[in-house]
A protein has these predicted regions:
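Transmembrane-helix signature of 12-pass secondary carriers
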Residues: 1-133, 137-341
């Protein structure tokens, strides 16, 4: 419930922010909410679900995250061309599902395990478990929890997980969690429209391609759920991470091969007349890196026009294999979905 409240506050405040500091604080609040939800939701599902459904329901938690990302891409595509500050609507619309989530959580029962372990409310927990899986399931689960309490009283310590017999398990668990984030998947999801725009696409086509990214993620998450019990987790991890490596190398090659060309045709595409006039002297020049380009262009424009160039005009000059970028990103997302996702 607290997490859902943080989502609602973050979305509303982000949309209404009047300054940079306010906006950053609002986004941090949302980040705290996301961190909490990612941790709490699967734990709650694991505690409340019957054993035969536990694996599937935890998988569906990830599937719902993927569906949410896809819905966000669709929403952004339809909102991007709104008059005024469309970004406010893109962020503010999140408050609707966040509020629904907040209200719906009041109907969700507390974790039976938590009720027994923390409050010793055995009868309350039994009623909840009976509704979920019947009386037999409730009796068996309560007995398991009671045995867990007895074992807990044997003075197990947190430091025990660092003992040598648990070392391999700890390394694997921490390694997967670390590499899941360090691969940069969140940057790809968050900046997908920007990546495609910098690859030479228009704003509309960039947001449309981001939808394709979301749908690819959704489809291959479903594939992973279907394959995980057939092939096992380790083969999927090996296959997925191998193709992720290939995809990142493809994207690196595409962006590293990009050039920025100034000629009559590319200059004609510039909408801002003052920028076009100021950059006419660069006609015939080609830049092989963005930093080199910015160093030169910055000497031709004042600060405001330079920012406008970076935000809106730079894509007019880039020459890049956009198809290779799209294939690389889609392969990367698909590979992540079946392995680390």
């Amino acid at each position: 419930i607290v997490v859902a409240a943080l989502f609602t506050i973050s979305a509303s405040w982000s949309a209404l922010a009047t300054g940079y500091t306010e906006f950053i604080i609002a986004r941090i609040i949302g980040g705290v909410g996301i961190g909490g939800a990612i941790l709490i939701a699967p734990i709650y599902i694991a505690e409340i679900a019957p054993p035969k459904l536990r694996g599937s329901l935890v998988s569906f938690n990830q599937l719902n995250i993927v569906i949410g990302i896809s819905v966000a891409y669709f929403s952004n595509y339809f909102l991007v061309n709104m008059e005024g500050e469309s970004w406010r609507w893109m962020l503010g619309v999140e408050a609707i599902p966040a509020l629904i989530y907040f209200l719906a959580l009041w109907t969700v029962p507390r974790s039976p395990r938590w009720l027994i372990l923390k409050l010793n409310k055995v009868e309350h927990a039994k009623k909840i478990m009976t509704k979920i899986g019947g009386e037999d399931y409730a009796e068996i689960t309560i007995a398991e929890i009671q045995r867990g309490i007895d074992k807990k009283e044997e003075n197990a310590k947190l430091s025990d997980i660092f003992k040598s017999k648990y070392a391999t398990i700890m390394i694997i668990a921490l390694g997967i969690a670390f590499f899941q984030q360090i691969t940069g998947i969140n940057a790809v999801f968050y900046y997908a429209p920007t990546i495609f725009e910098q690859a030479g696409g228009s704003t509309d086509s960039s947001f449309l391609q981001a939808i394709v990214v979301g749908l690819t993620n959704l489809v291959f998450t479903l594939v992973a759920i279907w394959l995980i019990d057939k092939l096992g987790r380790k083969p999927l991890l090996l296959i997925g991470t191998s193709f992720m490596t290939v995809a990142l190398l493809m994207a690196t090659f595409a962006f590293n091969s990009a050039t920025y060309n100034f000629n009559a045709a590319t200059l004609e595409k510039v909408n801002d007349t003052e920028i076009r006039t100021a950059l006419t002297s660069l006609e015939g020049k080609t830049f092989t890196s963005q930093s080199e380009l910015f160093n030169v262009v910055q000497t031709k424009l004042d600060e405001e026009k330079f920012l406008n160039f970076k935000r809106n005009e730079i894509t007019n000059f880039i020459q890049i294999n956009a198809t290779l970028v799209l294939i690389a990103i889609l392969l990367y997302v698909a590979s992540f979905a079946i392995s680390l996702g």
